[in-house]
């Protein structure tokens, strides 16, 4: 059964229905988990750890959405849909929203450093997401 909120996003064109692909989901889980493991390597630069953790979170969140039979029109929506694709508490998916904004600042506006607290919170939130999958 799908959430009425997800169905509303379909009607608005933000999501589209697409049959789940076990191969795609397995690949997203594999890549997400590998990136999550690498993000925990303290010898890497903080910016690298942030990038790895953010991309791990995105891959795992996309896997959760694909399992429900949907595909998102943009990256941010994958995180917003976690309220309907997982049982994660609000605080966890808000960390992903904060990380998405930080990622855009670093990528598109020339931000020069990653915040260590955010990186650690992002890794923890991504681990919580992985546990649900």
What are these regions (language model features)?
Residues 1-133:
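Terminal alpha-helical segments
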